[in-house]
A protein has these predicted regions:
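Membrane-interface "cap" regions at the ends of multi-pass membrane proteins
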Residues: 1-36, 48, 134, 151, ...
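C-terminal membrane-solvent junction of multi-pass transporters and transport-like membrane proteins
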Residues: 3, 319-390
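Transmembrane alpha-helical segments of multi-pass small-molecule transport proteins
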Residues: 12-16, 82-87, 108-130, 144-154, ...
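Extracellular loop-to-transmembrane helix junctions
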Residues: 27-56, 78, 367, 371
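Juxtamembrane transmembrane-helix boundary signature
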Residues: 42-74, 81-87, 380-387
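Hydrophobic transmembrane alpha-helices that form the core helical bundles
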Residues: 78-111, 257-273
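Hydrophobic alpha-helical segments and their helix-loop junctions in multi-pass secondary transporters
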Residues: 111, 128, 135, 144-170, ...
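Membrane-interface loop-to-helix entry segments
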Residues: 115-157, 167-168, 205-212, 307-319, ...
């Protein structure tokens, strides 16, 4: 089997991080002011990327897909449950990314949002058809173009240097941290789909984490800077006013395609976990078609509740996986369902939703994960291993 290099993995996650969704989420940080907002972005990404790294390392060391690693801690039934949720999450992300990309692109060249949905969806289909291992020069050219164009966008946003919006109290620091955690957290059920194929699992996971973390922070800062220094939350409009024209179209289309490809591709891999009869590539193509149709038919302007829902599902899940694999060093769940871990996950989910009502400076995810990991350790001490599964 052809393995992927650390550089190839880095390119994949560079493309994932450069996205309109990340820039738009960055605009939400403007009420904190630049310095405080930057701190919230950095703190959130350190928390989120630490989990991102451990999730990827489990896949790299075991050679399992993301949902395959879930089966180690939750059993086959637990794997099916999270795989189904992950497919739904990724259909949602595919729709949101195509919607945001089409909306922004239509601002630059107004030929109709639905047309751009079809164009972007069509390009994602091409990316899927070529395949993750054969993208090669296509990915390198796309990433080089994105890197240059992102620098241009950064210069356009920050060249004024004078804030036009004043900080206010509409967003707490803790809520901002949680928004920063949310993006790397949303990739947790995907990263092992790529690190499992790496030549050097540790190096590939580390390079993927660092690349994604740095570039994601950069995108957040561009969005926050746009809101603070231009007073405009629509990044496409900023590019149009700056006269970027074709460059703006390239940024918007390429960034949307390279990110959404990962969503659709991993949805296909997760779908394979649901049944051996499912072909991952065909499933990814179907997800792209569904996402394109949803992007055309439904409004998707505010994704904050969607991000928090992802956090409440997948933060306790990865907390249990990290505890099982790195602390308890369990070889895998026995039986079809690890009831003990399933109960701990439910408690972790409830804890996250409760913590959402409390303003914590480090956000909800870190205390939720700490609490879930502690519960998992206690449960393993109390419940004998033979009675854990069903």
């Amino acid at each position: 089997m052809k393995k992927t290099s650390s550089f190839q993995n880095s390119l994949i996650w560079f493309g994932a991080a450069v996205s309109i969704a990340e820039i738009l989420t960055g605009t939400y940080f403007a009420p904190l002011g630049f310095t405080k907002g930057l701190l919230a972005i950095l703190v959130g990404h350190v928390i989120g990327c630490a989990m991102f790294f451990f999730a990827g390392l489990i896949g790299g060391r075991t050679g399992r897909s993301a949902m395959g690693t879930v089966e180690l801690s939750f059993g086959r039934i637990g794997c099916l449950f999270f795989a189904a949720l992950n497919v739904l999450q990724l259909v949602g992300w595919t729709s949101i990314m195509i919607y945001d990309g089409a909306l922004a692109t239509n601002t630059v060249l107004g030929i109709g949002k639905w047309v751009w949905c079809l164009v972007i969806g069509g390009l994602i289909v091409v990316w899927i058809a070529v395949g993750i291992k054969n993208l090669g020069w296509i990915n390198k050219i796309a990433m080089a173009a994105l890197f240059i164009l992102s620098i241009v966008l950064c210069v356009v946003v920050f060249r004024g240097g004078t804030p036009v919006t004043a900080p206010d109290d509409s967003l707490s620091f803790g809520a901002a941290v949680e928004l920063a955690v949310a993006m790397p957290l949303s990739w947790l059920p995907l990263i092992s789909d790529y690190t499992r194929e790496a030549e050097k699992p540790f190096a590939a996971t580390l390079s993927s984490t660092l690349t994604y973390g740095v570039v994601s922070c950069w995108m957040y800062v561009i969005g926050m800077g746009a809101a603070i220094f231009t007073g405009e939350g629509d990044i496409a409009l900023i590019m149009v006013k700056a006269g970027l024209g074709v460059a703006a179209l390239l940024i918007l289309i390429l960034s949307t395609v390279t990110t959404t490809f990962l969503d659709a591709y991993s949805a296909g891999i997760s779908a394979e976990s649901l049944s051996k009869k499912i072909n991952g590539k065909y499933a990814a193509l179907i997800v792209t078609v569904i996402g394109t149709v949803c992007a055309i038919c439904f409004p998707m302007d505010d994704i904050t509740n969607f991000l928090y829902l992802i956090g409440s599902v997948f933060a306790p899940m990865i907390a249990i996986q990290i505890t099982d694999f790195f602390l308890l060093r369990r070889g895998g769940a026995s039986g079809k369902l690890d009831v003990c871990n399933a109960v701990v996950w439910v408690l972790g989910f409830v804890l996250y939703r409760v913590l959402m009502t409390v303003d914590i400076p480090v956000g909800n995810t870190l205390p939720d994960m700490a609490g879930t990991m502690l519960l998992c350790l206690i449960a393993h001490k109390i419940v004998p291993d033979k009675t854990r599964a069903s």
